[in-house]
């Protein structure tokens, strides 16, 4: 995204020093994201998957926050960035080939479909887990036991 939409600023933004700072910032943010799990006791053994995992029924507010910040916000950011890239590509293509009636070409449509498929596959893979989290957060006592075991081990 940065290389395509902000090409003039890319070299300055992604210098060696700034790249190292980004890696360090990502490590710090990862640790910050893990700390609430340790403090709230949301990491518990789940016999359905034979592993220690995030227990969605411990805190409704925390589960909702996890879904919002770890799924919904990234989805909105990805949508925004894909749209910006797509609009920029179309603007450049239309500027390069001015026509009286610019139309969407098959190649442009295929590129858009490819980007859309990647996004949809990401959403399909992660949405069920997050929507289950929201369902459990809405009523932990009754919803948690109703989640089928096969959903976690499939």
UniProtKB/Swiss-Prot annotation:
Gene3D superfamilies for this protein: Rhodopsin 7-helix transmembrane proteins (1.20.1070.10)
GO molecular function, one term: G protein-coupled receptor activity
SUPFAM superfamilies: Family A G protein-coupled receptor-like
Transmembrane parts of this sequence: 20-40, 63-83, 116-136
Residue ranges annotated as Cytoplasmic topological domain: 1-19, 84-115
GO process annotations (BP): G protein-coupled receptor signaling pathway
PROSITE patterns, sorted: G_PROTEIN_RECEP_F1_2 (PS50262)
Domain of life the protein comes from: Eukaryota
Stretches of the chain found on the membrane's Extracellular side: 41-62, 137-149
Membrane association type: Multi-pass membrane protein
Coiled coil: none
Subcellular location: Cell membrane
GO cellular component: plasma membrane
InterPro entries named in the record: GPCR_Rhodpsn, GPCR_Rhodpsn_7TM, Mel_1A/1B_rcpt, Melatonin_rcpt
Keywords, comma-separated and alphabetical: Cell membrane, G-protein coupled receptor, Membrane, Receptor, Transducer, Transmembrane, Transmembrane helix
Family from the record: Belongs to the G-protein coupled receptor 1 family.
Job of this protein: High affinity receptor for melatonin. Likely to mediate the reproductive and circadian actions of melatonin. The activity of this receptor is mediated by pertussis toxin sensitive G proteins that inhibit adenylate cyclase activity.
Protein name: Melatonin receptor type 1A
The species this protein was found in: Sus scrofa (Pig)
Gene behind the chain: MTNR1A
């Amino acid at each position: 995204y940065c290389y395509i939409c902000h090409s003039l600023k890319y070299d300055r933004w992604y210098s060696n020093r700034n790249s190292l700072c980004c890696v360090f910032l990502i490590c710090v943010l990862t640790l910050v994201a893990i700390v609430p799990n340790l403090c709230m006791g949301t990491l518990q053994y789940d016999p359905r998957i034979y592993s220690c995992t995030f227990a969605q029924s411990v805190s409704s507010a925390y589960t909702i926050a996890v879904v919002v910040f770890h799924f919904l916000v990234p989805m909105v950011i990805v949508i925004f960035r894909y749209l910006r890239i797509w609009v920029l590509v179309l603007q450049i293509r239309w500027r390069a080939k001015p026509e009286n009636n610019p139309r969407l070409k098959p190649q442009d449509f295929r590129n858009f479909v490819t980007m859309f498929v990647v996004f949809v596959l990401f959403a399909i893979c992660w949405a069920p887990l997050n929507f289950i989290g929201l369902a459990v957060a809405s009523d932990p006592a009754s919803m948690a036991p109703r989640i089928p075991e096969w959903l976690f081990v499939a």
